[in-house]
Swiss-Prot record:
The protein, known as: Type III pantothenate kinase
First-listed, main subcellular location of the protein, grouped into a coarse class: cytoplasm
Cofactor note: Monovalent cations. Ammonium or potassium.
Annotated organism of origin: Helicobacter pylori (strain ATCC 700392 / 26695) (Campylobacter pylori)
Uppermost EC category: transferase
Listed PANTHER family: TYPE III PANTOTHENATE KINASE (PTHR34265:SF1)
Classification via HAMAP family: Pantothen_kinase_3 (MF_01274)
Length: 223
């Protein structure tokens, strides 16, 4: 980016997180999302800074907003992990100590200590669990039912499928987190947080990390 422009107010730019299914935006503290087919209708006039994990959706954004800038190279997250996704990096950048859980199409769990990424793991997202059950056996093709508690054992196939799915995710998070604070983001964050007493939902976590990256690069100068 030639002679990087700097901004003193978040209101003057738009942050964009390009996912595998939808494209998410943050303008100041307003969050919204779009399918790739609807991007042009948004009519965004401000400078767009983005990250992307999906090449096709990234091309769709650039077709509509050719001046949008990829900020993947604007920062460094201390880690020995090879191939850490840019969305995971941004979420981790926003946390100094704790466990970051992004509960989207996949569920990623990452440990951060004093700003360093220690490692993490990846689980299927809740929707992917349902898809896997469906492929395994017809009787396991059950609709998702939100559970109120994991303390009561299931007494139906539908409840058993949902119980096993949710418990496997919660148990993995708790095993890695121990007593550390858990920061949740992604579409299923609020649901999972009900089973995790040391957790807090941070809907803007990835965007918070993007703000930090822009500040480190001298592009965003507001406090």
């Amino acid at each position: 980016m030639p002679a990087r422009q700097s901004f003193t107010d978040l209101k003057n730019l738009v942050l964009c997180d390009i996912g595998n299914t939808r494209i998410h935006f943050a303008q100041n503290y307003q969050l919204f999302s779009s399918a790739k087919e609807d991007l042009k209708r948004l009519g965004i006039q401000k400078e767009i800074f983005y990250i992307s994990v999906n090449e096709e959706n990234e091309k769709a954004l650039l077709n509509c907003y050719p001046n949008a800038k990829n900020i993947a190279g604007f920062f460094h997250l201390e880690t020995d992990y090879v191939g850490l996704g840019i969305d995971r990096q941004m979420a981790c950048l926003a946390v100094n100590n704790g466990v970051v859980v992004d509960a989207g199409s996949a569920i990623t769990i990452d440990l951060i200590k004093e700003g360093k990424h220690l490692g993490g793991c990846i689980l299927p997202g809740l929707a992917q669990y349902i898809h896997a059950y469906k492929k395994s056996a017809k009787i396991l093709e059950q609709p998702f039912k939100a559970l109120d508690s994991l303390e009561v054992l299931p007494k139906s196939t539908r409840d058993a499928v949902n119980y096993g799915m949710v418990l496997s995710v919660i148990a993995c998070i708790q095993h890695l987190a121990k007593n550390q604070k858990i920061y949740l983001c992604g579409g299923d964050a609020k649901y999972l947080s009900a089973f995790l007493p040391h957790s807090v939902c941070k809907e803007r976590l990835v965007f918070d990390g993007m703000e930090i990256a822009l500040k480190k690069a001298g592009i965003l100068e507001c406090k």
